[in-house]
């Protein structure tokens, strides 16, 4: 029976074989990898990944799709977690000593940002991540200071990862086609992020970008004096989108 994509799960299934093979080439699965796919859907990518790995895990919320997966794959090779990826504890996936998780997925666009922040908590235990996301989101993730789209997502994720937009995917590659272009992003956790308390950095960045049109002195009024900004090399008249990650970290370390 044909599965009808569900809007509430943000389901857009990747059906273009050329795009699928390009994604697999970018991931380059190896037999001993501990691979976990978020939202396998109709398993188009799952099947190709299983050609390269001995065993993999999938996290799927849609119970109908979970049943399809159970009927289609050997349970010794495909371990299915019927769960919401936003709530799932990825540390429960067993990984051989000396290895790390490889995480992949065509992420539901309606939960992409909170899911990326949830996964960031697992960064020390992850080798890499390859995700299909809305192109606009990927552009925000990799944006540099001075860009119109540089913001909270850019700073918080660049503190944790080296990221690269691999290639753009047109709406026609999906069923049903989304209204926007998509892109593949590669995320490699940094071995040594700049020393900083994550909660404090989040606090600073959230306040800084809550009023983008104001200068940083006004955005952070009540949290930092102008002298604090000057001491970490920030011109108080700059706008928040022009300030690099290292200076946000320096501010967080003053809290």
Swiss-Prot record:
UniProt keyword list: Cytoplasm, Methyltransferase, RNA-binding, rRNA processing, S-adenosyl-L-methionine, Transferase
One Gene Ontology MF term: 16S rRNA (adenine(1518)-N(6)/adenine(1519)-N(6))-dimethyltransferase activity
Leading EC class: transferase
Residues annotated to bind S-adenosyl-L-methionine: 12, 14, 39, 60, 84, 106
Pfam families documented for this protein: RrnaAD
Main location: cytoplasm
GO CC terms of this entry: cytosol
Localization in the cell: Cytoplasm
NCBIfam families xrefs: ksgA
Function per UniProt: Specifically dimethylates two adjacent adenosines (A1518 and A1519) in the loop of a conserved hairpin near the 3'-end of 16S rRNA in the 30S particle. May play a critical role in biogenesis of 30S subunits.
Name of the protein: Ribosomal RNA small subunit methyltransferase A
Organism, as annotated: Janthinobacterium sp. (strain Marseille) (Minibacterium massiliensis)
Lineage: Bacteria, Pseudomonadati, Pseudomonadota, Betaproteobacteria, Burkholderiales
Gene field: rsmA
